[in-house]
């Protein structure tokens, strides 16, 4: 059976009862030329442990884009970082809606079978998974709906396609059910339209770099406005899915685990051990608190009166009493376990460049959370190559953030393994927060590594703070300092409290984890996960403005620390950027790369060449070696006559500024398109002026000459 739904600017087509009919729920969803299959399967036997055994997998099939997987193994293997992060978004959006007491191992699988480059696969996949889950026999009150909000020319855009998102200064992803928000991910996108590199003279020795990059932070009011638009769209989508599919939902015969109450144990602990529990909560550090609570449990179990009680029942009841005391103290007294007020940030200490051989480092400590963040600068060959499903060629990632969370940071003796979903998610959040502050034209590849040495809440936000200062310590010209703070929420009987800079105890026993990062001028990234099943706009507004206070407090401390930074110039890599005649690049390379290999070995440098623009980048550890390599290359290009047979300069004497032509696109390069004007003469249409167009070779375009300089012509599109 097929349903076509016009919703939130998109036409969504769902096939139900067509494929994967042995799954508990399955749907084949089509949007544009994209097709995804979402399935839900569950086991019949419940787990004994007290947790939700939910697994989400998101798989992009290479054939969906007409590709064969690269590498030696020609099949899909372990998920990419992008797939893992999308699976995490789906998990975080759907998990809050599972009913209390649900304990059946459940797997949600979303497979991309056909990929349309214009379609937002993240939003589509969440909505497909939501409908599949709603159709199953798992009790869900209503379908979840996901939307994305962009901002183009100052206007918020609902569900921008991938092309529109390229021109957006905002990427806001929101999931919810009815009028409740469940999950938020937001990042500011720096405006790159005005960033250009100018060549001052023909094949100049130095490329002059100018930037007017805007970080495009959002104010708290702008975020609330965007969330309001998202909330209306989510209500629309959730209602539409419910109306279309409620009659096809399977009847639920699932038994939910009843929470086992032990009133006699609860009364005994509250009457005899409440004071000791409160002292353990309020007067001890994280590790000591856990140890003391275990001692209390053992003391209870050793009493004659408790000999018939199981250890599990005592521990579970003790945890309930602890949770109740923490929450009551916050709501009734406005006091937190470590004595702080609700909006108080823990003490902060900062040390920079403590690693003498690293390019830049920062040890950032906030309370019992400590991050050592290290910045490393590299050349073009150090960039991370990422193969995206909807891109023809791998893209180069110039700014990387790696987050590591060893067991010793929380006092555990666990093996150090490859990064899991949590590590990837925290690193991605820190990257999204810091990326707008880094100049797009900065010539080095940047890698930040965050080693969490101690953790008691907010380690991802410590990574943001330490990362911003590590960039400064490495001499990276970041536009502004960026700080992050994690907010929490306690909600009980129509009373609520918003907490600034939550620690692990408040995260575990609280109702929300809301991370906000940005500069003094606004927010660059935020992430919210809710345990309540939804949050209203007023509470969200309070959390945003309280986060702003905390962020500015942290930034003031960071600014003082930044003044004390002494950049270690000796260990930083050196870079020379200059230009040659593009036709001479082949001479620098030499036959089978012989010449460039000789230069690299002789001078101990790395060299990156841009064949289209004639740019040459030389990186090394010593200025003398770089200068010698540059002189050697200049000598090669000036002594050679060029090896391009039949190439000659075109006569441009008959061309003038403002002239208009109906040109033909002859060649497309990463930086723009070459448009033939007349008599074989080309003009360059820069990529920043044609981002909204999907150009192809031999396409006809009406253009006008905007600049004639150094024998080269630049053109603009005619309006």
UniProtKB/Swiss-Prot annotation:
Catalytic activity: RNA(n+1) + phosphate = RNA(n) + a ribonucleoside 5'-diphosphate
Cofactors demanded by this protein: Mg(2+)
Keywords recorded for this protein, A-Z: Cytoplasm, Magnesium, Metal-binding, Nucleotidyltransferase, RNA-binding, Transferase
InterPro entries for the chain: ExoRNase_PH_dom1, ExoRNase_PH_dom2, ExoRNase_PH_dom2_sf, KH_dom, KH_dom_type_1, KH_dom_type_1_sf, NA-bd_OB-fold, PNPase
Binding positions for Mg(2+) per the UniProt entry: 507, 513
Cellular component, GO, one term: cytosol
GO terms classed as biological process: mRNA catabolic process; RNA processing
Pfam families on file: KH_1, PNPase, RNase_PH, RNase_PH_C, S1
EC number from the UniProt entry: 2.7.7.8
Family annotation (PROSITE patterns): KH_TYPE_1 (PS50084), S1 (PS50126)
Compartment list: Cytoplasm
Location of the KH domain: 573-633
Function: Involved in mRNA degradation. Catalyzes the phosphorolysis of single-stranded polyribonucleotides processively in the 3'- to 5'-direction.
Recorded family membership: Belongs to the polyribonucleotide nucleotidyltransferase family.
Name of the molecule in the record: Polyribonucleotide nucleotidyltransferase
Species of provenance: Campylobacter jejuni subsp. jejuni serotype O:23/36 (strain 81-176)
Gene name, Swiss-Prot/TrEMBL: pnp
């Amino acid at each position: 059976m097929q349903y076509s739904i016009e919703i939130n600017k998109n036409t969504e087509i769902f096939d139900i009862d067509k494929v994967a009919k042995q799954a508990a729920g399955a749907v084949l969803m089509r949007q544009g030329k994209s097709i995804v299959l979402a399935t839900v399967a569950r086991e019949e036997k419940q787990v004994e442990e007290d947790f939700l055994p939910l697994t989400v997998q998101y798989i992009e099939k290479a054939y969906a884009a007409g590709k064969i997987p690269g590498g030696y193994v020609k099949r899909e293997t372990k998920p990419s970082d992008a797939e893992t992060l999308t699976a995490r978004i789906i998990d975080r959006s759907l998990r809050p809606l599972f009913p209390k007491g649900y304990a059946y191992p459940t797997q949600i699988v979303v497979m991309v079978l056909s990929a349309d480059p214009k379609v937002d696969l993240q939003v589509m996949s969440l909505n497909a998974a939501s409908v599949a889950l709603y159709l199953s026999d798992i009790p869900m009150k209503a379908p979840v709906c996901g939307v994305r909000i962009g901002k183009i020319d100052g206007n918020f855009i609902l569900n921008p396609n991938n092309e529109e998102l390229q021109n957006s200064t905002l990427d806001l992803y929101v999931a919810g059910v009815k009028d409740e928000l469940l999950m938020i991910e937001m990042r500011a996108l720096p405006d790159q339209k005005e960033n250009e590199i100018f060549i001052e003279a023909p094949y100049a020795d130095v490329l002059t770099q100018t930037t007017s990059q805007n970080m495009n932070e959002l104010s708290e009011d702008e975020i609330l406005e965007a969330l309001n638009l998202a909330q209306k769209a989510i209500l629309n989508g959730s209602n539409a899915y419910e109306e279309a599919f409620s009659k096809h939902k399977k009847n639920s015969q699932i038994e939910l685990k009843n929470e086992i109450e032990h009133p006699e144990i609860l009364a005994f602990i509250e009457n005899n051990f409440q004071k000791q529990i409160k002292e353990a909560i309020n007067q001890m550090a994280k590790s000591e608190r856990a140890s003391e609570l275990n001692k209390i449990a053992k003391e209870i179990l050793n009493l004659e009166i408790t000999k018939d009680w199981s250890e599990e029942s005592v521990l579970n009841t003790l945890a309930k009493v602890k949770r109740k005391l923490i929450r009551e103290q916050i709501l009734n007294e406005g006091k937190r376990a470590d004595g702080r007020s609700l909006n108080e940030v823990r003490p902060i200490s900062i040390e920079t460049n403590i690693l003498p051989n690293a390019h830049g480092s920062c040890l950032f400590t906030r309370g019992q959370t400590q991050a050592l963040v290290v910045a490393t600068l590299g050349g073009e060959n150090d960039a991370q190559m990422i193969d995206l499903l909807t891109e023809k060629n791998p893209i180069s990632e110039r700014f990387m953030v790696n987050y590591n969370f060893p067991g010793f940071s929380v006092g555990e003796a666990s093996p150090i393994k490859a990064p899991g979903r949590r590590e990837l998610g925290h690193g991605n959040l820190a990257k999204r927060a810091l990326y707008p502050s880094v100049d797009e034209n900065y010539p080095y590849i940047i890698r930040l590594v965050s080693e969490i040495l101690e953790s008691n809440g907010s380690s991802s936000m410590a990574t943001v703070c330490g990362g911003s200062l590590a960039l400064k310590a490495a001499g990276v010209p970041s536009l502004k300092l960026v700080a992050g703070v994690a907010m929490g929420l306690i909600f009980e009987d129509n009373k609520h409290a918003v907490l600034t800079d939550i620690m692990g105890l408040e995260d575990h026993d609280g109702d929300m984890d809301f991370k906000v990062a940005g500069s003094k001028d606004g927010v660059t990234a935020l992430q919210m996960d809710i345990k309540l099943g939804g949050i209203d706009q007023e509470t969200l507004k309070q959390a945003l403005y309280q986060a702003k206070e905390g962020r500015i407090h942290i930034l003031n401390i960071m600014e003082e620390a930044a003044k004390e930074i002494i950049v270690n110039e000796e260990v930083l890599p050196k870079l020379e950027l200059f230009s040659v005649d593009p036709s001479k690049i082949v001479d620098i390379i030499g036959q089978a790369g012989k010449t460039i290999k000789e230069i690299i070995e002789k001078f101990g440098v790395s060299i990156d060449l841009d064949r289209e623009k004639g740019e040459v980048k030389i990186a090394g550890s010593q200025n003398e070696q770089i200068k010698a390599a540059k002189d050697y290359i200049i000598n090669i290009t000036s002594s050679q006559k060029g090896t391009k047979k039949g190439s000659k300069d075109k006569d441009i004497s008959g061309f003038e500024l403002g002239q208009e032509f109906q040109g033909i696109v002859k060649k497309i390069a990463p930086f723009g398109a070459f448009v033939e004007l007349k008599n074989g003469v080309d003009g360059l249409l820069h990529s920043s002026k044609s981002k909204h167009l999907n150009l192809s070779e031999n396409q006809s375009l009406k253009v006008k000459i905007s600049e004639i300089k150094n024998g080269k012509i630049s053109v603009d599109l005619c309006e």
